[in-house]
């Protein structure tokens, strides 16, 4: 999609990505940067409890914990930031951006990523919904001993 006089392109590959694209395009039309657009678009997916692949309401790991990952890159500055296995933070994309902008690191993971996020003022939240918690409990009771397909 062409935005204004520039040639920014916003693309999504999954059905839930349409709302993400809309948010990113809106950000660009409001004068935001490409980084702002990436962050706002990803944040839509992260906050959508209907999207079980990421973020709030996402499928928990075998321990019943939703862990999230995100990465962001800025080509002109050859910068990148990412987080992995982050727990309890709604918008990992924003934490990844903060890693890129204020940290000497390119990636933070697990407890270190969570500690950094909290130090940067991000709020801790429970990423499980009641529905995903119940689904995990059923899985734990019926399939926990079987082979795993995702964690």
Regions found by a protein language model. Name each.
Residues 1-151:
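Alpha/propeptide regions of enzymes that mature by internal proteolysis
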């Amino acid at each position: 999609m062409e935005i204004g006089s520039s040639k920014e392109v916003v693309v999504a590959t999954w059905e839930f990505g349409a709302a993400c694209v809309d948010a990113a395009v809106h950000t660009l039309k409001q004068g935001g940067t490409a980084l702002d657009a990436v962050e706002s678009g990803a944040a839509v997916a992260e906050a959508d409890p209907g999207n079980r692949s990421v973020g709030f309401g996402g499928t928990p790991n075998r321990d019943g914990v939703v862990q999230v990952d995100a990465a962001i890159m800025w080509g002109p500055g050859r910068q990148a930031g990412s987080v992995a296995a982050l727990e309890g933070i709604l918008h990992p994309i924003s934490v990844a951006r903060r890693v890129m902008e204020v940290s000497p690191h390119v990636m933070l993971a697990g407890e270190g990523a969570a500690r950094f996020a909290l130090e940067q003022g991000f709020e801790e939240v429970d990423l499980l919904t009641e529905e995903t918690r119940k689904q995990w409990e059923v899985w734990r009771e019926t399939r926990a001993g079987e082979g795993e397909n995702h964690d």
